[in-house]
Design a protein with these regions (language model features):
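Short beta-strand/turn micro-motifs composed of small residues
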Residues: 14, 57, 105, 131-132
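Conserved alpha/beta core of the MobA/IspD/sugar-nucleotide pyrophosphorylase nucleotidyltransferase superfamily
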Residues: 6, 168-271
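Conserved core of the sugar-phosphate nucleotidyltransferase
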Residues: 62, 111-195, 201, 212, ...
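Short glycine-enriched, charge-decorated loop/helix-capping segments at active-site entrances
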Residues: 25-31, 189-192
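Conserved N-terminal catalytic core of the sugar/cofactor nucleotidyltransferase
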Residues: 1-9, 35-121
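Left-handed beta-helix
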Residues: 258, 265-266, 271-272, 277-278, ...
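N-terminal nucleotide-binding beta1-loop-alpha1 segment
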Residues: 1-23
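Catalytic cores of nucleotide-enabled group-transfer and carboxylate-activating enzymes in metabolic
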Residues: 8-9, 42, 50-52, 92, ...
Length: 352
């Protein structure tokens, strides 16, 4: 059945240059929590178990797909960046006729599977938009509704008049619609607008004209739909991501001496009654068993720390296995391949 989970195909738009990043690197390759922005979006897409993932790339050329050699994705080149509508047009031939198509943005890394499942459920045989209320200055496209509250169209900021810019409901850029509808609407898009581009958002007015229902959904947390357009944006999202990690750790019994001073740049698996002091960095896959204590200013990378171990302040552990009830540090360094048996002690005089 059209719109069922089994028919889901995802398009990720990742072709943009990101001029405000002031970088030679494609925007989606900039890192959040130690991983490229696009990696976060790919992981979320995979969590939905789609039939296919199509990534539209352009700026930076083959550097983008080359950075993800293990990704289960269909890479689609947008040779000339002519807008989001053109990006989806490039991917249209790859979609199955019965596909429910979910369009994601490669520079919006904090979107969650739960929010996207809700959005897809509301698409049915129509179209569903992810919108949110923005009570701060921004340049998102505005959602225009009629007197009965039905969505009429989306007006991009540069094309909006003063009254439209005053609207608070804005477009996140994420939407879901059957591929059959997209094939009908995309060829009808026009570049007659302030940016001279094909706006994907213009399909909303076409849907309304065709009598196709337009539904909306909202994220549980506004940070889910915040995008990265500058280094400042990236810094804000980095903190939002780390706050989310801190909340999840505390929910499973970890004591953080200051949740605002924690950096998880990979996967941190922690048992109960773990205590982590301030300014610690965890990279790659790190496992902390029950009752582990980690002192301030430690860096732990791709390591396992067994039950009851104590890692004192200013210690660096890289690719090591630390046994139960060990004491490491302060100011110690364990190099890759180090294995410490139970109750061992290593201080600042030892670098393994």
């Amino acid at each position: 059945m059209q719109g069922s989970v089994s028919s889901l195909e995802i398009i990720i738009l990742a072709a943009g240059q990101g001029r405000r990043m002031a970088s030679a690197k494609p925007k989606v390759l900039h890192t959040l929590a130690g991983r490229p922005l696009l990696t976060h979006v790919l992981d979320t897409a995979m969590a939905l178990a789609p039939r296919a993932i199509h990534v539209v790339y352009g700026h930076g050329g083959e550097r983008v797909p080359a950075a993800f050699p293990e990704a289960s994705a269909d890479w689609v080149l947008q040779a000339e960046q002519r807008g989001t509508g053109d990006a989806v047009r490039c991917a249209l031939p790859r979609l199955a006729d019965d596909a429910l198509t979910l369009v994601l943005l490669g520079d919006v890394p904090l979107i969650t599977p739960g929010t996207l499942k809700t959005l897809c459920a509301r698409a049915a045989d129509g179209i569903a938009l992810l919108t949110f209320e923005a009570h701060y200055e921004n340049q998102y496209g505005r959602i225009v509704r009629d007197d009965q509250g039905r969505v009429e169209r989306i007006v991009e900021w540069r094309d909006a008049d003063a009254a439209q810019r005053a609207l608070r409901e804005v477009n996140s850029g994420v939407l879901a619609a059957p591929a059959a509808h997209l094939r009908r609407w995309i060829p009808r898009l026009s570049a007659t607008n302030a940016q001279g581009e094909l706006y994907l958002t213009d399909i909303i007015a076409l849907a309304v004209a065709d009598g196709v229902p337009v539904a909306t959904a909202s994220p549980g947390d506004p940070t889910e739909v915040w995008g990265v357009n500058s280094r400042a944006d990236l810094a804000v999202l980095e903190r939002a991501f780390q706050e989310r990690q801190a909340a999840m750790l505390m929910a499973v019994g970890v004591q953080l001496m200051d949740p605002r001073r924690l950096d998880v740049r990979g996967q941190l698996i922690a048992g109960r009654d773990v205590q982590i002091d301030v300014n610690c960095v965890f990279e790659g896959r790190v496992e902390l068993a029950d009752d582990v204590r980690v002192g301030a200013h430690c860096v732990i990378r791709d390591s396992r720390i067994a039950r009851g171990a104590r890692i004192e302040a200013h210690t660096v552990i890289d690719g090591a296995d630390v046994g139960p009830d060990c004491v490491v540090g302060p100011f110690a360094r364990l190099r890759p391949g180090t294995v410490l048996g139970g109750h061992a002690r290593r201080d600042d005089r030892v670098q393994r």
